[in-house]
């Protein structure tokens, strides 16, 4: 698991501005943008209201979110999934990322409802680049 920094009051204010809502279930800051603001938050696998939440690494940096949204809108997930089917080394690396994601989430808590489910389509397809970029950062 990457180093997770504690959340400050300034972080919460920045996250509210980034998200347009109050952040939920934040465990800490997993990545900071160049300006020092949160870029990726680590989120509890169970939200305060009891809802299971498989997205451990939630991308919040507005510039990165916008860039990833542009790439997603171009439909690259289909091509990326095709590459996973054709390239055994790439598929093995993607499976390893899936396992690492599950291990990171397990370190934050065990939630039976989402056991074995990572995020972003892992390990067999590419579904949500926001999750994958958040994990990579």
Task: Indicate where each model-derived feature is located.
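Preference for intrinsically disordered or flexible, low-complexity segments
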Residues: 1-137
């Amino acid at each position: 698991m990457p180093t997770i920094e504690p959340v400050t009051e300034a972080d919460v204010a920045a996250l509210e501005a980034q998200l347009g809502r109050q952040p939920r279930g934040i465990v800490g800051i997993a990545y900071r943008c160049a300006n020092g603001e949160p870029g990726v938050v680590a989120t509890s696998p169970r939200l305060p209201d009891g809802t299971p939440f498989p997205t451990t690494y939630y991308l919040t940096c507005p510039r990165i979110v916008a860039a990833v949204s542009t790439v997603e809108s171009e439909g690259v997930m289909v091509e990326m999934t095709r590459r996973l089917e054709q390239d055994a080394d790439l598929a093995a690396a993607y499976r390893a990322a899936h396992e690492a994601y599950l291990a990171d989430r397990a370190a934050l808590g065990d939630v039976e409802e989402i056991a074995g489910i990572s995020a972003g389509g892992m390990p067999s397809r590419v579904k949500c680049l926001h999750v994958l970029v958040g994990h990579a950062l």
